[in-house]
Structures are given as structure tokens and as C-alpha cells.
Amino acid sequence: MVHFTAEEKAAITSLWGQVNVEETGGEALGRLLVVYPWTQRFFDTFGNLSSASAIMGNPRVKAHGKKVLTSFGDAVKNLDNLKGTFAKLSELHCDKLHVDPENFRLLGNVLVIVLANHFGKEFTPQVQAAWQKMVTGVANALAYKYH
């Protein structure tokens, strides 16, 4: 179980309140697919993923990115129970989709990069540390069913 201090919770929730879920989610998933192209195999129904511009402009990537980032919103609301919050998604990704759990860590790291890019100086080292802790906790919660 991940323990967040009051300061970490405040840093996470304060920034989350400013996140454009649709824009940031689409960018994070798009970057994941560009930077780690082997992750594209899980999205074979998404159409054209042949280039970075095709991926970043793909409406299905954007829509699924929004869905993924919305689930991070559930994490923000349930920082003290990440494992429980992601139990069903862990089961889905393990049993049905067979996603390599390492991809959860990669997506979390990409999300931190996207947030840093969007928020600039506001994304201080302390804010980054809190978010990195959260995305690691989410990745571990999503990987739980695999163990």
C-alpha cells in the first residue's frame, strides 16, 4: 500500500484540478504509442498508427487517452486505496487483454512528462515526486492481478 503525506495529496489534487483530461490523456497515450511502438499491438482496432502524426491525430487514441486519464482521476480521489480502485481494471488487463504490466509503468512515466510539459515551472520537483509516486502506485495496482 502506498502512503501519501498530506503535502503529496495536496500537490496531486491541486494540479489535477487544472488538468484538461481530454487533451492530456490523448497526448499521453499518443506519446506512449510513439515512444514505445510495441505497445501499439494492444490497439490494433484503432486504425492508422503508421506515424507519429497519424497517432497523435487519431481520434480513437484521443478518446481512449481521455478514458485512461479519467481513471487516473479515480486514483486522485482514492489515493488511500489504489489497489481496490483498480482491482477490476487489473483483472481486465490481465485476464482478457493480456497487457504486459510494464506498460502501466511506461504510461505513468509518459504522463509525468506530459504534465511537466503542460505545467512548466508549476510542476516543481516536489509536485513531480508526488505524481511519480502516484503513477507508480497506479501501475502497481494495475499489475496486482498478475501476481
Curated annotation (Swiss-Prot):
Chain positions recorded as heme b binding sites: 64, 93
Tissue and organ distribution: Red blood cells.
GO-annotated biological processes: hydrogen peroxide catabolic process
UniProt keywords, alphabetically: Heme, Iron, Metal-binding, Oxygen transport, Transport
Pfam families membership: Globin
Gene Ontology MF term list: haptoglobin binding; heme binding; metal ion binding; organic acid binding; oxygen binding; oxygen carrier activity; peroxidase activity
Alphabetical list of Gene3D superfamilies matching this protein: Globins
Record-annotated Globin domain positions: 3-147
Keyword DNA-binding (UniProt): no
Signal sequence region: none
Cross-referenced InterPro entries: Globin, Globin-like_sf, Globin/Proto, Hemoglobin_b, Hemoglobin_oxygen_transport
Example of a GO cellular component annotation carried by this entry: haptoglobin-hemoglobin complex
Entry function: Gamma chains make up the fetal hemoglobin F, in combination with alpha chains.
Quaternary context: Heterotetramer of two alpha chains and two gamma chains in fetal hemoglobin (Hb F).
Family per record: Belongs to the globin family.
Name of this chain's protein: Hemoglobin subunit gamma
Protein's gene: HBG
